[in-house]
From Swiss-Prot:
One of its GO terms (molecular function) is structural constituent of ribosome. Belongs to the eukaryotic ribosomal protein eL15 family. It comes from the Eukaryota. GO terms for biological process: cytoplasmic translation. Its main location: cytoplasm. Keywords: Cytoplasm, Ribonucleoprotein, Ribosomal protein. It comes from Paramisgurnus dabryanus. Component of the large ribosomal subunit. The ribosome is a large ribonucleoprotein complex responsible for the synthesis of proteins in the cell. Component of the large ribosomal subunit. This is Large ribosomal subunit protein eL15. It is found in: Cytoplasm. The gene is rpl15. The lineage of its organism: Eukaryota, Metazoa, Chordata, Craniata, Vertebrata.
Length: 204
C-alpha cells in the first residue's frame, strides 16, 4: 500500500485515540480563525487528490466554517403571512447539506474561481469545517491540460449554486442503483411527473 492508502485508513478510524486528539486540537485551531480562509495546502491530501486536486499552480484550497443545526426562517418578528400550516419558523430543515452550503459560500467569495469539490475536515458541537477545492480557470496550467479543460467552459460557472458538485448532487437525490429510483429521469420532479401523468395512447 502507498502512503495515501495508509492515510485513508487513518481517517476512516476517527474514533481512534490519535484521530480524536488530532481532530479536537484542529477544531480548536479552526475556531480561532475566520469563518472563511485560504489554506496553503489540504489537510487531507489523499482525499483532495481523489476529488481531483493536484499540488500545482491553479489549484486553491479554502477552509469554511458552517454553523450546525437547522435553518431558522428569516422572517421579521415571525410574521410569515398566510395559512397556519405554513407558519413554521424554527423547526425548518434546509433542503441541502451543510457541505453544499460551504461550497456555495466559497464560490460567492471567490467569484473568479470554479468550485471543483469539497470534503469534511472536522466538527464540534457548534460548527462543521469543510475544505473546498477551487480552480483558477485562467491559469495556463489548467487551460492547457486536457484533463482539466472541461471546467474552464462557461457552462460550469457557479456549478456549486446549481447542485452540480458531488455534495449538490447528493442533496438532489441523484446517483446510480436502487437507492436512487426516485430521481430516474433527471430529478425528483421529473420522475414524479412521468409516473403520475396518465397517457392514453391512441390505438392504431
Amino acid at each position: 500500500m502507498g502512503a495515501y492508502k495508509y492515510m485513508q485508513e487513518l481517517w476512516r478510524k476517527k474514533q481512534s485515540d490519535v484521530m480524536r486528539f488530532l481532530l479536537r486540537v484542529r477544531c480548536w485551531q479552526y475556531r480561532q480563525l475566520s469563518s472563511l480562509h485560504r489554506t496553503p495546502k489540504p489537510t487531507r491530501p489523499d482525499k483532495a487528490r481523489r476529488l481531483g486536486y493536484k499540488a500545482k499552480q491553479g489549484y486553491v484550497i479554502y477552509r469554511i466554517r458552517v454553523r450546525r443545526g437547522g435553518r431558522k426562517r428569516p422572517v421579521p418578528k415571525g410574521a410569515t403571512y398566510g395559512k397556519p400550516v405554513h407558519h413554521g419558523v424554527n423547526q425548518i430543515k434546509f433542503a441541502r447539506s451543510l457541505q453544499s452550503t460551504a461550497e456555495e459560500r466559497a464560490g460567492r467569495h471567490c467569484g473568479g474561481l470554479r468550485v471543483l469539490s469539497s470534503y469534511w475536515v472536522g466538527e464540534d458541537s457548534t460548527y462543521k469545517f469543510f475544505e473546498v477545492i477551487l480552480v483558477d480557470i485562467f491559469h495556463k496550467a489548467i487551460r492547457r491540460n486536457p484533463d482539466t479543460q472541461w471546467i474552464t467552459k462557461a457552462v460550469h460557472k457557479h456549478r456549486e449554486m446549481r447542485g452540480l458538485t458531488s455534495a449538490g448532487k447528493k442533496s438532489r437525490g441523484l446517483g446510480k442503483g436502487h437507492k436512487f429510483h426516485l430521481t430516474i429521469g433527471g430529478s425528483r420532479r421529473a420522475a414524479w411527473r412521468r409516473r403520475n401523468t396518465l397517457q392514453l395512447h391512441r390505438y392504431r
